[in-house]
């Protein structure tokens, strides 16, 4: 039986690969997509997500979400993804529109209609998820688990200690990590290992139409290079759903720093149990890189 999932995203070049995997992995049933401000503005992430759904002729409802963090000024990652978020490929014009509901209400309604609890996957800032949990607490029993790309048990990528998705809205992340729902965190500890090699990247134009499109986008992606390999951060959250055997997880207490002058957005991961607090997150720490690369090749070959 396919696993029903809702995907919250901020496309973003590596988001495009994660969305492809969510659509074409035969083990998954992507039922709803929502967008959030992150890599670029929410207007741009929504446009990019609709372009991708049209490209793959995927009839999946999409709702636009939060345009700003809960309490902070927005930040973005245009330096990594380009000003549009997905520069490099000329997508065909379309007439698709997002749902009228804001993202967190669309998630609420879809959860309440679902016949069984649903897995939420969040690969951008956690603003929409925090709004859902704070404004609609009745939804919690309907969430099977939350799988995120975000955080780090060590170094950051937008500050010395903080990963971008968490640092973009630390208050939202803190709300989510305190919520009591089951969380799997695929942070930089594994996503920095999730590299597609130059040899594989060179085969993409001949793979299929998705390969051609991704190859064009990758030429504008700044998380690595076509010559040294590219890190597929967001794809790790989808990979864990399908191939959890590729990941080594450890249950840990995780809190989010919201006050520090230099540490705001840091995920404080208590790997050794120093704080004596019960674990609230399953933290991914290691990745079978070759197995991951093989799985990526298999799923993208299906993305026609």
Swiss-Prot record:
EC class (word): hydrolase
EC number per UniProt: 3.2.-.-
An example molecular function term from Gene Ontology annotations: uridine nucleosidase activity
GO biological process, one term: purine nucleoside catabolic process
Keywords on record: Glycosidase, Hydrolase
Active site residues of this protein: 233
CC per GO annotation: cytosol
PANTHER family, per the entry: INOSINE-URIDINE PREFERRING NUCLEOSIDE HYDROLASE, NON-SPECIFIC RIBONUCLEOSIDE HYDROLASE RIHC
Listed NCBIfam families: PRK10768.1
Family designation: Belongs to the IUNH family. RihC subfamily.
Function: Hydrolyzes both purine and pyrimidine ribonucleosides with a broad-substrate specificity.
Protein's name in the database: Non-specific ribonucleoside hydrolase RihC
Organism of this sequence: Escherichia fergusonii (strain ATCC 35469 / DSM 13698 / CCUG 18766 / IAM 14443 / JCM 21226 / LMG 7866 / NBRC 102419 / NCTC 12128 / CDC 0568-73)
